[in-house]
Amino acid sequence: MARAKFERTKPHVNIGTIGHVDHGKTTLTAAITMSLAALGQAKARKYDDIDAAPEERERGITINTAHVEYETQDRHYAHVDCPGHADYVKNMITGAAQMDGAVLVVSAADGPMPQTREHILLAKQVGVPNIVVFMNKQDQVDDEELLELVELEVRELLNDYDFPGDDIPIVSGSALMALEALNGADSMKKGDNEWVDKIYKLMEEVDAYIPTPERDVDKPFLMAVEDVFSITGRGTVATGRIERGKVVVGETVELVGIRDTRSTTVTGVEMFQKTLDEGMAGDNVGLLLRGVQKEDIERGMVLAKPGSITPHTQFESEVYILKKDEGGRHTPFFPGYRPQFYVRTTDVTGTISAFTADDGSAAEMVMPGDRIKMTVELINPIAIEQGMRFAIREGGRTVGAGVVSKILK
């Protein structure tokens, strides 16, 4: 069968598999690609291909992540799977693989386990908006009542972390049985094999339940300032990469962060020495600003659609602290620790005032390799919003990564 040309006609969604070690995340990922490949909608990927995930660096942190892509009738998916638990934690906190939704894999034979809980909590903290559940290893459970019991447990657990546990689709099946059927068959269509059909059913639920995300260009405009120039006779130009939205010549934008928020008008948009009518998400541009002096702007400020983002100094965050062998600190740190927080394009000094463990208790100190919730107070207000990522640095070296889970003031 000739491989069809990849047309970007379908909406694109990023998803990932999450759940406890050995509950079958990678096997399921392989089963999804194999079953959709049988319909000509994916390239089949074997378990070993996915498990040998390449190393990536994101915000100074090394993470192993496997990326696969496939299509359903309605959508194109990019799917991320991590081999180790630590990779999941780092991946979700750094946002290396942004997820619009996740497939939570729970072994029907074991029920929810500690990492099941931890991944659900992480999904909540880092803003993964939707979860669909796959109850795996159904072939190992003869008792229908036991299946129902595990399903109830999973729904309760999701409710505990403010996901709509009663409404979330749960599909049971066996990724391994599906893979074996697919490996042994020359061709496969819906209705040929009950185990493969359960994988198709899962993808139908993912299609229906996980909404298509708003595209970056449709969000309110935001560009973090990287550099500032003064052009004689023309004015001040701020350069940077547009993070989201679009900006049109003549539009009013706000300059937010470090100092008082002020408005200015964009009188020109330039890219690669050419003038444009508008810049959009992903473009590296220079914006010519009316009535602003070069000294009024500095790196670390953002230009944004008026009213869309505000400056803050205090927030709660979910953080991963690097281990010594990852290039992190060698020693623990305590409340009162003052590192730099690298947000978008700049370092801002801040004080860490409190640590909270998963169970809500206060932690006395943080060790390299820990994941912890911490309260941070910055010395300068900067444009912050929930779900925003940052790195924690000490003398230019990354010692941790975090995501804003709640703005305090």
Curated annotation (Swiss-Prot):
GO CC terms, sorted: cytosol
Spans annotated as G1: 19-26
UniProt xrefs under SUPFAM superfamilies: EF-Tu/eEF-1alpha/eIF2-gamma C-terminal domain (SSF50465), P-loop containing nucleoside triphosphate hydrolases (SSF52540), Translation proteins (SSF50447)
Main location class: cytoplasm
Annotated stretches, region: G3: 81-84
Region listing for G5, in residue ranges: 174-176
Segments of this protein annotated with the region G2: 60-64
Name of the featured protein: Elongation factor Tu
Gene responsible for this protein: tuf
